[in-house]
Amino acid sequence: MLDKHGRKINYLRVSVTDRCNLRCVYCMPPEGIVKKEHDNIMRYEEIFKVVKSASLLGVNKIRFTGGEPLILKDIDKLIYNTSKINSIKDIAMTTNAILLEDMVEELKKAGLKRVNISLDSLKEDRFKSITRGGDINKVFKSIEKSLSIGMKPIKINTVIMKGINDDEIDDFMNLTKKYPISVRFIELMPIGEGRKLYKDGYISSEEIISKHSDLIPVETDKSSTALLYKFKESKENIGFISPMSCKFCSGCNRVRLTSEGTLKPCLHSEKEVDLKNYVDSSQALLSKINETIYNKPLEHHMIEEKESKSKKMMYQIGG
């Protein structure tokens, strides 16, 4: 469907849980989070009702996120049932891949088409530091397993932080020359725990691109959040997601369902609608989703204000 600004909204990002098995420095506090009561998070059945309703309004792309979505007990069932909705053409997932190796075959059979893997360092000790305890070897094994069963292309999402991992930019770029792996460099955002790192840690996409004159621009769909490039010898693209230096609001095609059941028409807006109040009535749910999508804000003002208006943390929204 179209929002009131004429944008086609066909993409729903679904945060299935706010829990995670890592504690990345820009996302989650070191002590973790207080576990929410069961009544305060969406059940599997409620999530599916929202997905089904959204599909009736023209949504044909679903991405499951977290927290860490592989923690959800019924994630394979949710993917399978979503894949049976005829109008849904693409089902993807963003994961830290710690648990992916043992699950990826079943997830693919269930209908998962693609995975984005959050990976902010290729160095074992640094990865452990950024994630506060993660085992990078589990991630590498998950990538190898995913490639071996034909889950291609895999996209790696890397949040670049000055003085923390910006010395690995070339190493990440070179992955695209060796493997059918895309890399997405994401600008650090002043949201949640990222606020603490932003002043000293922010580095713009433009600064990175300017240092790599051999990058070749690739034609990009208007709704894409990334500017795409590649090297002459690349197997896949290198993307730059630049919410701070070059917002992509004019072509935005997405809304977000949080793990608490609120529908956010904009990642960086404080506006959201609690859908848990409507899931028992299919018509009321459909109407409320329709209304929320139609009233999606024209744009965010995070570039000007240097801060997200969203009160939620990234692990609640799913990015």
UniProtKB/Swiss-Prot annotation:
The entry's keywords: 4Fe-4S, GTP-binding, Iron, Iron-sulfur, Lyase, Metal-binding, Molybdenum cofactor biosynthesis, Nucleotide-binding, S-adenosyl-L-methionine
Annotated residues for binding of [4Fe-4S] cluster 1: 20, 24, 27
Radical SAM core domain: residues covered: 4-227
Iron-sulfur among keywords: yes
SUPFAM superfamilies found in the cross-reference section: Radical SAM enzymes
Cofactor(s) listed in the protein's UniProt record: [4Fe-4S] cluster
Pathways per UniProt: Cofactor biosynthesis; molybdopterin biosynthesis
Record-listed S-adenosyl-L-methionine binding positions: 26, 67, 118, 189
Gene Ontology BP terms: Mo-molybdopterin cofactor biosynthetic process
Residues the record lists as binding [4Fe-4S] cluster 2: 249, 252, 266
PANTHER family: MOLYBDENUM COFACTOR BIOSYNTHESIS PROTEIN 1, MOLYBDOPTERIN COFACTOR SYNTHESIS PROTEIN A
Protein name, as recorded: GTP 3',8-cyclase
Organism, as annotated: Clostridium botulinum (strain Langeland / NCTC 10281 / Type F)
Gene for this chain: moaA
